[in-house]
Amino acid sequence: MDVNPTLLFLKVPAQNAISTTFPYTGDPPYSHGTGTGYTMDTVNRTHQYSEKGKWTTNTETGAPQLNPIDGPLPEDNEPSGYAQTDCVLEAMAFLEESHPGIFENSCLETMEVVQQTRVDKLTQGRQTYDWTLNRNQPAATALANTIEVFRSNDLTANESGRLIDFLKDVMESMDKEEMEITTHFQRKRRVRDNMTKKMITQRTIGKKKQRLNKRSYLIRALTLNTMTKDAERGKLKRRAIATPGMQIRGFVYFVETLARSICEKLEQSGLPVGGNEKKAKLANVVRKMMTNSQDTELSFTITGDNTKWNENQNPRMFLAMITYITRNQPEWFRNVLSIAPIMFSNKMARLGKGYMFESKSMKLRTQIPAEMLASIDLKYFNESTRKKIEKIRPLLIDGTASLSPGMMMGMFNMLSTVLGVSILNLGQKRYTKTTYWWDGLQSSDDFALIVNAPNHEGIQAGVDRFYRTCKLVGINMSKKKSYINRTGTFEFTSFFYRYGFVANFSMELPSFGVSGINESADMSIGVTVIKNNMINNDLGPATAQMALQLFIKDYRYTYRCHRGDTQIQTRRSFELKRLWEQTRSKAGLLVSDGGPNLYNIRNLHIPEVCLKWELMDEEYQGRLCNPLNPFISHKEIESVNNAVVMPAHGPAKSMEYDAFATTHSWIPKRNRSILNTSQRGILEDEQMYQKCCNLFEKFFPSSSYRRPVGISSMVEAMVSRARIDARIDFESGRIKKEEFAEIMKICSTIEELRRQK
């Protein structure tokens, strides 16, 4: 059927149609190949913005470093990173004056966190640069490798499991003359396969010891690995993002904890809250400005955009901010917090995989690793790449580029927000001392600025003053990309405000559909997404009902579980038809077993198993939810699980859904091809780690291994817990005498083995 799209909008207010203009349907673009070019762009741009700074050489690593701090004030509108220390400090002082005690209180909160955080905090997070293997690894593995290397180099502060003690090890490791590490390498050899008599390549994985001198170790400790940011919509060019190693992560975590604590107390900060809470916070600021602009005042809002926020920020500035914020605090605390910015002032950017060359005529492909870019003849490269390499060459050391100015993406979101808010804070009349004044919102690099003044000239003067004040601290408002409107219409972090926030529904589109975890989770996530959008995003009842029908259809096609009485033939239809015919109460069958859909928009909050439980045949119930059924993989399932859903912008967010352990909540097995690669050893370590943690959780159901278990080891803790539990069970008659004796015997054997070890 043909629909004239303009008809759809006849009854819709213009602001509600905004979401149709967003590039959020279909698959987002992914990057292919290496990120080396993007990383070189970042490094070169960052240096260009600070080019009038002073050059120095790092005495430890020999890396050339550019310091733009207190550099020349800009004379044009080009972006620049010449922040003035005294201006930043003054902005901090005024921020504290308007919020008495804010820094003091946040420091106290952070100090508590610093003393309590366990080192396993660092296992959260995705890919992490593993300096021992010089490539990315899952965070838990990278941490385990780091601790293992520290141990073998006589650094043992972190045995107690506090993050702060691990950081002491990091500091000590940097003073060592050399560090011995274990690296993995592959041996390939051609052997004849006994079965097929063909020649095959066999890979074996070896471990070898390697010594790093102080300089090499420092370079690795200060390295950020770079990748291309994937799935960015609405952009033509990709860009590089960084992942730091374990040495930097802990320090960054504490700085961000402090900054987060400050942001929570600032009404202009869009972080760390999100969703409806954020909307309420923003609406408050707007309301304040609109009520205060009496009939005599004009009020305008700028939907702001900053040019290259990260690349013009400077870690040295962050150091100045932290020094000021913590000025009355104990020495140890100030030291811990100042290390992150110091490390970032000396950071190195790893250039990634390098370039791939192929010769069409000779059908040859060859990889030029980043390490070779310093010496290779440039005639092989095209014009633009040649320029990049020439520019970056003076900065290269061992395949990494020295990058002192600038912050890589997403490292200090909270702290940079504090800096932005401190400028918004200066808009109060008592600081501007004229007829105009401003306020606004800041969330990392995104901002909205509301300016009030008696006339248009005043508005213009206010905007100019804000623009110039920002320049003093290295923030560059883009005049091309920011636009101004009467207050009441603006956009901030993809929230559109028009006398209240308009639901931008298109942003949620990517999270509709079947997630592909397993039949049980997918059903639950699918209906939860629809429910959440009815609550938060103006998804009306009719549209929700339609979304539900489309979802069920999509779900049935994905898992080939069409109703038992359908004519559609799939791989599963034979089994499902048989089940349908054998079942007395057909309404009790789950959708994934070919049953009917009983969901409507009123009962989306009920898990499907509960919805149909009373309708199920008894033997079906018994098969579906029997813990002894070998097909039910029971991870200890709490009543609530977390799924990762992909909204259209921003990071993947975690969404809670009700989880039910049935025969449908299977966990797919790991792809076997990994077992033949160099990752195999890592995989085994990871599984071992996983098994130990799972075992430990069985003994301590509250999974209290996040808290210190005192000085005893995990094994001792489990043995003593087993003894206590066994005694209680024996005395209450839950277990027999023989079982009790057997448990005690096993415990003694374990202790004996530990002694012998």
Curated annotation (Swiss-Prot):
Keyword Kinase assigned: no
* Name this polypeptide is given: RNA-directed RNA polymerase catalytic subunit
Organism from which the protein derives: Influenza A virus (strain A/Duck/Germany/1949 H10N7)
Keywords in UniProt for this one?
Eukaryotic host gene expression shutoff by virus, Eukaryotic host transcription shutoff by virus, Host cytoplasm, Host gene expression shutoff by virus, Host nucleus, Host-virus interaction, Inhibition of host RNA polymerase II by virus, Nucleotide-binding, Nucleotidyltransferase, Phosphoprotein, RNA-directed RNA polymerase, Transferase, Viral RNA replication, Viral transcription
UniProt motif Nuclear localization signal: location? 187-195, 203-216
- Name the residue ranges with Polar residues bias: 55-64
Q: Which gene encodes it?
A: PB1
Tell me yes or no: is Cell cycle among this UniProt entry's keywords.
no
Q: What does the entry give for GO biological process?
A: DNA-templated transcription; symbiont-mediated suppression of host gene expression; symbiont-mediated suppression of host mRNA transcription via inhibition of RNA polymerase II activity; viral RNA genome replication; viral transcription
**Family from the record:** Belongs to the influenza viruses polymerase PB1 family.
Taxonomic lineage from the root: Viruses, Riboviria, Orthornavirae, Negarnaviricota, Polyploviricotina
Which cysteines bridge via disulfide bonds?
Answer: none
Give a short account of its post-translational modification: Phosphorylated by host PRKCA.
Per the record, its GO cellular-component terms are: host cell cytoplasm; host cell nucleus
- Main localization of the protein described in the UniProt heading: host cell
